[in-house]
A protein has these predicted regions:
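N-terminal pre-triad scaffold of radical SAM enzymes
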Residues: 1-18, 42-46, 50-53
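Detector for the c-type heme attachment site
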Residues: 22-25, 60
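Conserved alpha-helical substructure of the radical SAM core
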Residues: 26-53, 74
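Conserved SAM/AdoMet-binding glycine-rich loop
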Residues: 46-169
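C-terminal, non-catalytic macromolecule-binding modules
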Residues: 150, 170-180
């Protein structure tokens, strides 16, 4: 529909998850220039877009390659100042890169939908290591609790991989319990 649009802020991925071909297909992570992103968003608002969906293979890495630090929170604050948008949604927030600044920005900006799309993939530390990802059930639970503490009505969306090579029935059951 004409009232919704996707705004791609970067291309590629540097995460190198063992199951994923995106880095080979799309190449290394490359942030767009923040001014170009804001200008494109202004054009979308002028055309009547009300819901803006901010996307990249890993939105939380935005800016690290160009500016030497994460810039997603700053970008979101700038997008919120654009007249016309009612809702701004952020997709594909890699769990290792979710900062307190990002959580605070999502919590504090009325236009940002209180919705976190975080591809967790699994909760078992051994499975995550074989996936070439970080964390474990404890660290992921701590992250989710931190987000819920600052954004009480947050809605989470995630993806999980079951049947990953070497996953035991016990690890599968742990994931099923975690995701419930």
């Amino acid at each position: 529909p004409p009232y919704t649009a996707y705004l791609k802020i970067a291309e590629g991925c540097d995460n190198r998850c063992s199951y994923c071909a995106i880095p080979m297909i799309r190449g290394r992570f490359r942030s767009r220039d923040i001014e170009d992103v804001v200008k494109e968003a202004e054009g979308l608002a002028e055309r009547g877009v009300k819901e803006l969906n901010v996307i990249a293979q890993d939105t939380t890495r935005f800016g690290e390659d160009k500016y030497g630090k994460p810039m997603l929170a700053e970008l979101l604050r700038r997008l919120c100042r654009i007249d016309g948008f009612k809702w701004i949604r952020v997709l594909y927030c890699y769990p290792d890169r979710i900062t307190d600044e990002l959580i605070d920005t999502i919590a504090g900006e009325d236009k940002i939908v209180k919705y976190m799309d975080i591809p967790l993939q699994h909760c078992d530390g051994d499975v995550l290591r074989r996936m070439n990802r970080h964390g474990d059930r404890e660290s992921l639970t701590a992250l989710m609790n931190k987000i819920k503490d600052k954004i009480p009505n947050v809605i989470f969306r995630s993806t999980f991989i079951t049947g990953f090579p070497g996953e035991t029935e016990e690890q599968f059951n742990e994931l099923a319990e975690f995701a419930a």
